[in-house]
Amino acid sequence: MEDSFAPDNVRSRLLFSGLKELETHGVSDFSLRRVAQDAGVSCAAPYRHFKDKDELIGAVIGFVIEGWTLLSEQISGIFSSDSRSLVIELAVAGLRFWIANGNFRTVISASQTLDKAPLSAFEKPITDAAKRYMSDNGASYSDTLSFKLLSMIYGAVILVDGGYESAERAAESLRCVLSSEL
């Protein structure tokens, strides 16, 4: 069944299927058999790429974090000379990333039982931008700004999930609030 696919392609399909499995069934009911079936490979295929389900879950978490890292690095490069815009755009991108990747929340929740690294990887670019913004404006950094930024992002995600706000309106509202506050 999987012979027509390159090994890297099979691994990628297993990661995508693992992400869907986490979103649908969570960590406690995670099934390598369902992942293999969804990826269109044999039940033995996951074991050729991952030692066990924990290793696959860890790889899925790494895959999601890598997506955010690439996005945040691109934004940091674009707004490298304007720390205010950098804070705003990273916060809006973070919100859009969480909304567009509902499975990211599942992965983060799942990973909290493993370690805090995935959540830290999401928060670090935003916190670093807040530190730089404070420094550029002659203020000493306190974690209050980061707390406010992250609270607004997480709160907006909850509002969108609850149907109180559309994703686009939440992103624009966040941008508007940050533009007036910074």
Where are these regions (language model features)?
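Short hydrophobic/aromatic patch on the recognition helix
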Residues: A39-F50
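Basic, helix-initiating cap at the start of DNA-binding domains
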Residues: M1-H25, L32-D38, E55
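Solvent-exposed, amphipathic alpha-helical segments
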Residues: S17-H25, G67-I78, M152-L159
